[in-house]
Amino acid sequence: MKRVLTALAATLPFAANAADAISGAVERQPTNWQAIIMFLIFVVFTLGITYWASKRVRSRSDYYTAGGNITGFQNGLAIAGDYMSAASFLGISALVFTSGYDGLIYSLGFLVGWPIILFLIAERLRNLGRYTFADVASYRLKQGPIRILSACGSLVVVALYLIAQMVGAGKLIELLFGLNYHIAVVLVGVLMMMYVLFGGMLATTWVQIIKAVLLLFGASFMAFMVMKHVGFSFNNLFSEAMAVHPKGVDIMKPGGLVKDPISALSLGLGLMFGTAGLPHILMRFFTVSDAREARKSVFYATGFMGYFYILTFIIGFGAIMLVGANPEYKDAAGHLIGGNNMAAVHLANAVGGNLFLGFISAVAFATILAVVAGLTLAGASAVSHDLYANVFKKGATEREELRVSKITVLILGVIAIILGVLFENQNIAFMVGLAFAIAASCNFPIILLSMYWSKLTTRGAMMGGWLGLITAVVLMILGPTIWVQILGHEKAIFPYEYPALFSISVAFLGIWFFSATDNSAEGARERELFRAQFIRSQTGFGVEQGRAH
């Protein structure tokens, strides 16, 4: 159970997300032709959208932010599509299938970061930034050092997330489609590069919107059929599930997932603040026209995601009833065919037959593509906009910047494919957990304090940001997941699986201490600039001109 939790805990939406940690033993399934045909339809349709988008991408603004022409509703759907993962869909329903009520608590953990984004970040981020969150962090601070730190934080998060996505994609497709792992990884990598290379943010947005609609439809249909089976009574749903589950009434008892309060708190903080520091999520707020639309984006996204995670709870209990109690879905040893992560897929077959099973399998693949496209664009923009155009070659033309961005997309895609193949048999669950810890410990403190704390200086942001990033990496390496399970040592030096509680504390303390003790003239000037930044963040004055910081 501990390994299941570790794998799933590392698959935060994180969104974001894709088969973030379909890890452990994978049994290749027979080739599923219905799923392959439906997925090919999705690919052809989205490539058509990419061609359409490529005709409309004429400038840097079009490429990075779809020209700021996405509506709040569309962006909310796209954010949900970027955040709701195959791990969310398969992993949480599998967690409910095995642990019951605890799965609901865990699924709600995916949402706790969104009120922070809604009330503290979305409006000011949109008013101050243009293409990346580094625009905001460096608004009144030194451009070079802050952009380098922000870009490094973004690239580390993107790289870890992308590797986990690619490995998860290969294993998931092997499970659902019966395709060879290497073919699956190459296919995801090539499609990802095509979406981003030719269609930029516009194509990525519509891939994410389509994926969100398909996933919400599929999950809604499954939940509807489950509730129909029990007469639309939650009481009947829980009673029937308790009657057939090996744990009986214990599946309705909370508290079995995390072994101690420190781990629970650290996991919660990582989920909450990590979400608010994910570069591919933050980038989406620059695709709308103003702060009002940015707020609407979060409102709609939170609604869609909250609805989705409630559905996964119903799907998990439905799987207990209709899959767990049906020997047709068990192997000779009495285990679920393909492993517990297949619970939702088997339920799709139980409630909708082979055709719907093919649909859900294709949606799971589409989910991965939507996430990796967003990640790739975020990584490319960090290199081309933050590093190339604002640090290494100031004054670069739009054409030069876009060329660097597209070269970066190709490099990221090739690296992702190679590492996806190399990590095939490795435990990659820790990578997404580490990505969230870094986002929470490096990106989030700098974004938050740059917008809200007038005494922040470049010195404080640099020292605190780097300390948070390094602490998260070191503690993760010394913890049980890497030190014991991967490196094979007998006992972990750092006893907790989740470093966020400690690394976030180090980051905030470092930023406070080194800013408070900064008596330089540069520090004083940066403090004075806060008032002008505050007015811009509240009013959005000047944002219409798309000022480049």
From Swiss-Prot:
Alphabetized CDD domains for the sequence: SLC5sbd_u4 (cd11480)
Chief location category: membrane
GO MF annotation: an example: acetate transmembrane transporter activity
One GO term (biological process): sodium ion transport
Alphabetical UniProt keywords: Cell inner membrane, Cell membrane, Ion transport, Membrane, Sodium, Sodium transport, Symport, Transmembrane, Transmembrane helix, Transport
InterPro entries in alphabetical order: Cation/Ac_symporter_ActP (IPR014083), Na/Glc_symporter_sf (IPR038377), Na/solute_symporter (IPR001734), Na/solute_symporter_CS (IPR018212), Sodium:Solute_Symporter (IPR050277)
Role according to the record: Transports acetate.
PANTHER family assigned: CATION_ACETATE SYMPORTER ACTP, SODIUM/PROLINE SYMPORTER-RELATED
Protein name per the record: Cation/acetate symporter ActP
